Amino acid sequence: MIMSSYLMDSNYIDPKFPPCEEYSQNSYIPEHSPEYYGRTRESGFQHHHQELYPPPPPRPSYPERQYSCTSLQGPGNSRGHGPAQAGHHHPEKSQSLCEPAPLSGASASPSPAPPACSQPAPDHPSSAASKQPIVYPWMKKIHVSTVNPNYNGGEPKRSRTAYTRQQVLELEKEFHYNRYLTRRRRIEIAHSLCLSERQIKIWFQNRRMKWKKDHRLPNTKVRSAPPAGAAPSTLSAATPGTSEDHSQSATPPEQQRAEDITRL
């Protein structure tokens, strides 16, 4: 049996094809971008699952945000903290991350420089002052003065002292026994009641004036009657005009008649 084939035939010439590099250099094989393969995969995926799931809604186009160095967080920061807190807690790390980004060679036009590292702004004094309540000078004035060892007796402005019930009670007790105080007793009362000597002195002056006003009688100017044990000689010496009348009344009527006869 005779075998006839192309391999056995000696007249057969082996075809020679150029390598693939020559095809790519001569643009015989078109080069596709990566987007082309992505489109084919997406189209095939949608083709297989188009019946099961509806097409997703179109995504809105958001403007690209330019991130600065403040948005970078250090390795020690916990998740969820904002850029202000990261810069506040780790200022050294944030400063080390603030470096100019290298320019890419693909961009022909120079890209705008990133904004400078924003440091945490200090709190405004007006906001801190608005939170604190306003205290006026008249609110700082304490009406009940305390004991001052260096008190020299002079005050810039006199103010009405508001005495407490305990202070008034102790002063009334002292006034009941002593209407006039000595210097030593005044100092003791001032220290015990947390008052100054001047305040004790003024209170006793006012209390004495009130006592005199309350005990003043309407007939104080009328001469009072003499006591029962007084001698009549003192009264006669005090009033010479009335002594003659008393002597005449003391003589018996017979002597008066004798004197009248002698006068005739």
Curated annotation (Swiss-Prot):
Q: Name one GO molecular function term.
A: sequence-specific double-stranded DNA binding
Which is one Gene Ontology cellular component term of this protein? chromatin
Which residue windows does the record flag with biased composition (Basic and acidic residues)? Answer: 32-51
Q: Which UniProt keywords apply?
A: Developmental protein, DNA-binding, Homeobox, Nucleus, Transcription, Transcription regulation
Broad class of where this protein is predominantly found: nucleus
Q: Which PANTHER family match?
A: HOMEOBOX PROTEIN HOX-C4, HOMEOTIC PROTEIN DEFORMED
Q: State the family it belongs to.
A: Belongs to the Antp homeobox family. Deformed subfamily.
Name this protein carries in UniProt = Homeobox protein Hox-C4
Recorded source organism is Homo sapiens
Please name the gene that encodes this protein: HOXC4
